[in-house]
Amino acid sequence: MNLQESRRVLEELGHPVLALPEDSAGRFPDGDAWRIEIPSCEGPRVMAAVIDEASQRGVKIHRISQGSGVMMLTDAEIVEMVRLGREHDIEVCLFLGPRGSWDTGGQAKVSAAVGGVARGGRAVAASLVDAFRAVELGVNSLLVGDLGVLQLLDRLKSDGRLPADLVLKTSVLMPLPNGPTAAIYERAGATSLNVSTDLDLSTLGEIRAATTAPIDMYVEVPDDQGGSVRFYDVPDVVRIAAPVYLKMGVRNAPNIYPVGQHLAGTAEALGRERVRRAEMVLRLLAAEQKGDPS
């Protein structure tokens, strides 16, 4: 029994499931409605472990993202990640390192919502240094946690100092709870939007109606961002929010940022488990598509 069949049974029993928003007609350039993103891919060793696990499980990975920041990777590590990405057709998205939760201000310690901001002009300048360094080493996708930095990067793309096709992906640390906010981020230069982790399906539909950029959504949410596990929502998420990246967090796992050799084993194990989670989500999607009368 898949979800569609289960809903028909509930309706027969007098408990119909309320209608959801209309299907999204949006798609990625290749025509797909969804892609798989593995977050917290902290360096080439973790990326290699993720690729190995994906090969064993038959899971296609479209994007990996890294959270410790460009500043926490050596040039050689970045170059190796870019090489792995090209070899396996995976987008490599690196976080811009400076952020409020690592800075001197106490406010960032009391709310994760401001953890990704660049505090002051010095942090903004450092973010641009990270951006240019990553691009010079072959990276074509940046993970941005600050609205002002996002807009500056977009201006640098427009005047030719950064590549016109550079992906600017907003971080989950930039709250995105509604359509108007999504539209603001897109106008500021975002080309991929990480929505807030606790949104219902109707709100996702509103965000999709407000923007054409791909949506990124955690379907298992890290504990420090809410801890939801939403596997059974995924078929409806794809239907409503396409084009959408399905992100695999892992609950009951430590926050490993900034990662280093002292956490290498943990980071690799978490990367492999995220791929396993992706396999389970893909099984659900396949079951729903098999049962779709269309």
Residue ranges and their predicted role:
Residues 1-139, 144-176, 201-294:
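Active-site pocket-lining/capping segments in soluble small-molecule metabolic enzymes
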Residues 183-186, 203:
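Acidic/histidine-rich catalytic cores of soluble enzymes
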Residues 142, 190-196:
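Conserved catalytic-core segments centered on acid/base and nucleophilic motifs
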Residues 133, 181-184:
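Well-formed, non-transmembrane alpha-helical positions, independent of function
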